[in-house]
């Protein structure tokens, strides 16, 4: 919470976490820190706007086709390996068939309709509201099956990942620009 409070708290927090723990020489200007908040608290909402402007559906379709072609080529390569036993090939093909591909942006956007950001409230009150909403959103998932379609990155993130525990790749729209 220190990052959202007065300069005294922000500076003390940076002195410890930024300088002492991370070796940073200076913190980002306040305006840059403030501009990063919507991205971190409303990632998919910002991502939806980003995608509408910069990543048309045809680009997603083209990337999905390219990945499917790579999967087909890899499947053929596995089938032709002479050093791999038939049982191991079958397991490799099974894993390849179960591979999850996330390209560009989610097929279903996160619903933020229960989150209220009130311009008449203080910045801190709105940060608390967003934090509470995020916590409740996570608690709603408790005891339910894992949503394998949920993204761990927003579309405007310039990064990509392979998650071996879920056997998925994710290439957000921004990394594909």
Predicted regions and their residues:
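Structured mid-domain segments that build the active-site/substrate or prosthetic-cofactor binding neighborhood
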Residues: 1-41
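Intrinsically disordered, low-complexity linker/terminal regions across diverse proteins
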Residues: 28, 39-177
């Amino acid at each position: 919470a220190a990052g959202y409070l007065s300069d005294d708290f922000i500076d003390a927090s940076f002195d410890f976490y930024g300088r002492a723990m991370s070796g940073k020489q200076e913190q980002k200007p306040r305006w840059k820190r403030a501009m990063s908040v919507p991205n971190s608290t409303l990632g998919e909402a910002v991502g939806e706007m980003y995608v509408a402007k910069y990543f048309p559906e045809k680009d997603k379709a083209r990337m999905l086709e390219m990945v499917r072609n790579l999967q087909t080529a890899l499947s053929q390569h596995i089938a032709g390996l002479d050093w791999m036993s038939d049982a191991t090939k079958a397991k490799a093909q099974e894993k390849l068939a179960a591979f999850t591909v996330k390209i560009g942006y989610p097929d279903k956007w996160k619903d933020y309709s229960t989150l209220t950001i009130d311009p008449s409230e203080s910045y801190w009150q709105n940060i608390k509201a967003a934090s509470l909403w995020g916590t409740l959103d996570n608690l709603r998932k408790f005891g339910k099956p894992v949503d394998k379609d949920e993204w761990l990155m927003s579309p405007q993130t310039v990064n990509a990942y392979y998650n071996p525990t879920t056997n998925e790749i994710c290439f957000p729209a921004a990394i594909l620009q």
